[in-house]
UniProtKB/Swiss-Prot annotation:
Its EC number is 2.8.4.3. Its main location: cytoplasm. Residues 5-122 form the MTTase N-terminal domain. It comes from Xanthobacter autotrophicus (strain ATCC BAA-1158 / Py2). Binds 2 [4Fe-4S] clusters. One cluster is coordinated with 3 cysteines and an exchangeable S-adenosyl-L-methionine. Pfam families: Radical_SAM (PF04055), TRAM (PF01938), UPF0004 (PF00919). This is tRNA-2-methylthio-N(6)-dimethylallyladenosine synthase. It is found in: Cytoplasm. The gene is miaB. [4Fe-4S] cluster 1 binds at residues 14, 50, 85. GO terms for molecular function: 4 iron, 4 sulfur cluster binding; metal ion binding; N6-isopentenyladenosine methylthiotransferase activity. Residues 384-446 form the TRAM domain. Keywords: 4Fe-4S, Cytoplasm, Iron, Iron-sulfur, Metal-binding, S-adenosyl-L-methionine, Transferase, tRNA processing.
């Protein structure tokens, strides 16, 4: 009996890459591959890449250099594939820079992996970055029950890909293509299958998810709000989320869904990028700061317990001190529970990359640090406001200590619970007793509170809140 071939997949970047990595693994499982967590023992390594910032792309080449050295030292014949947005953007250039790569495959061709691998194994240098007309989702197999259970009780479902917004800093329209929405029936089939396999929480994902306009089973075009209303009726589905959204597509129906659907979590990730109207216009965001404030006000009226997350770019070409102060002002006024902040990174082929007024790196670094301090304080204040409150926590995985389980709050916070009277996949009502820099701790709502000295998070080391260049 032959040993099964081993597959190692490493995902960089967004949730959609995680979803795509799972689907690639499901596809290759049919070819006899089993996943491993050790690239050294893999017969095939896939790097599923992100191209949104220069540092993210360069991480891929660093990883390829490490894999090349590993192959040479071990004398192995491991095949190496580069997938994702770097593959789409750079194509054959990847093989020129890193000859160790056997296969380059773009996001729309994952269903062709078995035949592409066969070509690569036969000695061909394979690059497939086409945007085929057929729906790749029609050709990707569903995960097995065992695969779904191994990934935990929370799952992603892609409902939309691509973006038509063409923000001047962004490569997504070029690497993922135009906006395409999946048919409602296919989405519902996938969601129902996941719930049947034990999933309790589904996050609907897309590059611009709230632009969803899928063909409904009744012959009409469905919005994201209507899709979620339908999905919320699935027996056994406890939670719904969606990401990533664009302010231009936050309509009243979607806001009302947060009011009307108890399964829809009171947490919204809504990237604003800048608090300056001048910079927002230069970014081609097609909304202003007052538009953003109006959305937040409506959202909080519809769902008073709503918490917000966002993305920010500092040092966009032409950003003045006044523009940056406008961003700080927006952060103070909104009060974010979490946020991601980045230095502007010029991406080849985007309009902003050719802008004359590039901001010096040292200025970008100073502004990022200042913004990060403010966002960190905002996050800490929100986390502290959760102390003493009671939430339903979805238990997702074991903790580091015996008897611990770790779950997620409605606000995506990691919550540690000692010896819970529940199992992974259960929703447990928990009272938050302690707040650490990276997680919360709690006890079952009917239990007594532990002392601070017993807290599993009280001594945790702090880390910056997603302060990134990549």
């Amino acid at each position: 009996m032959h040993e099964p071939r081993k597959l190692y997949v490493k995902s960089f970047g967004c949730q959609m890459n995680v979803y795509d990595s799972h689907r690639m693994a499901d596809t290759l499982a049919r070819e006899g591959f089993v996943e491993t967590q050790d690239p050294a023992e893999a017969d095939l390594v896939i790097l599923n890449t992100c191209h949104i910032r220069e540092k993210a792309a360069e991480k891929v080449y660093s990883e390829l250099g490490r894999l090349r050295k590993q192959k040479q030292e071990a004398g192995s014949d491991t095949m190496i594939a580069v997938a994702g947005c770097v593959a789409q953007a750079e194509g054959a250039e990847i093989m020129r820079r890193a000859p160790v790569v056997d296969l380059v495959v773009g996001p729309q061709s994952y269903h062709r992996l078995p035949e592409l691998l066969a070509e690569a194994k036969a000695g061909k240098r394979v690059v497939d970055t086409e945007f085929p007309a057929e729906d790749k989702f029609d050709h990707l197999p569903a995960p097995t029950r065992a695969a779904t259970r191994s990934r935990g009780p929370a799952a992603f479902v892609t409902v939309q890909e691509g973006c038509d917004k063409f923000c001047t800093f962004c490569v997504v329209p070029y690497t993922r293509g135009a906006e395409v929405s999946r048919p409602v029936a296919k989405i519902m089939d996938e969601a129902a299958r996941l719930v049947d396999q034990g999933v309790r929480e589904i996050s609907l994902i897309g590059q611009n998810v709230n632009a969803f306009h899928g063909a409904g089973p009744d012959g009409t075009t469905w919005s994201l709000a209507r899709l979620m209303e339908h999905m919320a009726r699935l027996d056994g589905l406890a939670r719904l989320r969606y990401t990533t959204s664009h302010p231009r597509d936050m309509d009243d129906d979607l806001i009302a869904a947060h009011r009307d659907l108890p399964q829809l979590m009171p947490y919204l990730h809504l990237p604003v990028q800048s608090g300056s109207d001048r910079i927002l216009a230069a970014m081609n965001r097609k909304h202003g700061r007052d538009d953003f404030f109006a959305i937040i006000e409506k959202m909080r009226q519809a769902r008073p317990d709503m918490a917000l997350s966002s993305d920010f770019i500092v040092g966009f070409p032409g950003e003045s001190e006044k523009d940056f102060e406008d961003t700080l002002d927006l952060v103070r006024r909104v009060g974010f529970a979490s946020a991601y902040s980045f230095k502007y990174s010029p991406r080849p082929g985007t309009p902003a990359a050719d802008h004359d007024a590039q901001v010096p790196e040292e200025v970008k670094a100073e502004r990022l640090a200042e913004l990060q301090r403010l966002l960190e304080a905002s996050k800490a204040a929100f986390d502290e406001s959760c102390r003493g409150r009671t939430f339903d926590i979805l238990l997702e995985k074991p903790g580091r200590q015996a008897g611990q389980l770790i779950g997620r709050s409605p606000y995506l916070q990691s919550v540690v619970v000692n010896d819970p009277p529940a199992a992974i996949g259960d929703l447990l009502t928990v009272t938050i007793t302690d707040v650490g820099p990276n997680s919360l701790a709690g006890v079952p709502a009917e239990a007594s509170e532990p002392s601070v000295s017993q807290s599993p998070v009280s001594s945790a080391r702090s880390r910056p809140l997603a302060a990134m260049e990549a």
